């Protein structure tokens, strides 16, 4: 009986994790273009800083 409950708990946790991942993926997809642009700006800024340091 205890084993059955443990399996059920694991399944529920996995379902919750999958749901979170799906929600995160959706949020990421919505924000990814803005995020990518920001990261590219940071990379470019980082390259400039490295050049300035040398």
Curated annotation (Swiss-Prot):
GO BP annotation list: sporulation resulting in formation of a cellular spore
Keywords: Sporulation
Residue ranges, compositional bias (Basic residues): 45-54
Stretches with biased composition (Low complexity): 10-21, 29-44
Coiled-coil features, chain-numbered ranges: none
Span list, region Disordered: 1-54
Site (Cleavage): 27-28
Domain of life: Bacteria
Function, in words: SASP are proteins degraded in the first minutes of spore germination and provide amino acids for both new protein synthesis and metabolism. These proteins may be involved in dormant spore's high resistance to UV light.
Family: Belongs to the gamma-type SASP family.
Name by which UniProt lists this protein: Small, acid-soluble spore protein gamma-type
Organism: Alkalihalophilus pseudofirmus (strain ATCC BAA-2126 / JCM 17055 / OF4)
